[in-house]
Amino acid sequence: MAAAVAEVPAGERGATRVADRVVAKIAAQAAREALRTAAPDTRTDAHASVTIRRRDDRQSLGEAHVRVAVELGYPSDIGAQCGTVRYQVAERVRALAGMEVPDVAVEVERLHSPLEESAGRERVR
């Protein structure tokens, strides 16, 4: 039995496919991790959508084009936070899913102001 397996070339034995929703979950979690690191005291949230372009060869898992929507605290360095998210998402998807990530689009859905949050806690007379 072992001799029969050894005769089949590695590329013809099968392939691993990572589902789009799994890559989206990895990307969203990576974005949340990046935001917690960049602004630990600020309320943040993130979710992601992914488009995967699969290649015909079995040696590659394909490319993941990621779009991440985030909520950030304000005032803050929004550009730096988006850059941190972009880098972290690309690295985590590459490491955990084995896919190349040529681009990560970061969309800021909402900004949270400390004044807005404290206004909700004030007592009404």
Task: Label the model's feature ranges.
Residues 1-84, 95, 99-125:
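Contiguous, often N-terminal, cationic amphipathic patches that form binding interfaces
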